[in-house]
Amino acid sequence: MVRSKHMKILAANAQADSSNTEARQSLLFSQSPIPNAESRLLVAGVDEAGRGPLAGPVAVAAVVFDPNKPRINGLDDSKQLTAERREQLYARIVDRALSWSVVLIDSEEIDRINIYQATMLGMRRAVEGVAHVAGFARIDGNRVPKGLPCPAEALIGGDALDRAIMAASIVAKVTRDRLMHELHAQHPEYRFDQHKGYSTPMHLAALQTHGPCPQHRRSFAPVRLALEGREQGSAAIGDPEQLQVAQLVAPL
């Protein structure tokens, strides 16, 4: 497999830690005790985190539960959980999953191919990371990426309906949030640890003051306007009402 500098694949291994930079630069596979014939019955849940922010990567996770391990209680859409609760569930998920993977597509690649294509790429790579044990993928949303290694279906609102998708949403969110804390250490002026790259007033004010850093998505309108330094860009960044208009121009 060719590893792009723009794409980092986190281990499908219960002992790998998403805060480990070295682990994020390689693809590891967990060993599956389940024969290939039985693996066709296992479903991978797939979800993303970070499509909308102005900075940082989009993270996509795939999770296959181990049917021989206890059920995890309290799973939900990651957006409905506190950060503390997500961390607790993350630890249980990676411990009890038969296999899991996380793919990070960085801002440079997002700008190159657009956020939609970056998300589809991440989904395909995440499913590839668990395809040795999963015979089917269930993906949150309304689109199935092309080129998946197994049959799949899209499930609108799946992060509130399917337990494996819920788990994937938690793994993706926790992984991305941890990385944004690392990026905060590199660029403290933006306070990535507070808003995780989303377009909050704090973040927009920092953009106006400091301009974009390498982690910002220059294809997103508020960042592009800040970079260009145009008068209308300054108005869009400083005025919350104008910001909503600017965000409509950004890829969804």
Curated annotation (Swiss-Prot):
GO MF term list: manganese ion binding; RNA binding; RNA-DNA hybrid ribonuclease activity
Comment on bound cofactor: Manganese or magnesium. Binds 1 divalent metal ion per monomer in the absence of substrate. May bind a second metal ion after substrate binding.
UniProt feature coiled coil, ranges: none
Cofactor: Mn(2+); Mg(2+)
EC number, UniProt record: 3.1.26.4
Keyword terms: Cytoplasm, Endonuclease, Hydrolase, Manganese, Metal-binding, Nuclease
Catalysis performed (reactions): Endonucleolytic cleavage to 5'-phosphomonoester
Domain RNase H type-2: from-to ranges: 41-232
Entry keyword annotation includes Phosphoprotein: no
Keyword Membrane found: no
Main location: cytoplasm
GO biological process: DNA replication, removal of RNA primer; mismatch repair
GO cellular component, one term: cytoplasm
EC category: hydrolase
NCBIfam families given in the database record: PRK00015.1-3
Name recorded for this polypeptide: Ribonuclease HII
Species for this entry: Xanthomonas oryzae pv. oryzae (strain KACC10331 / KXO85)
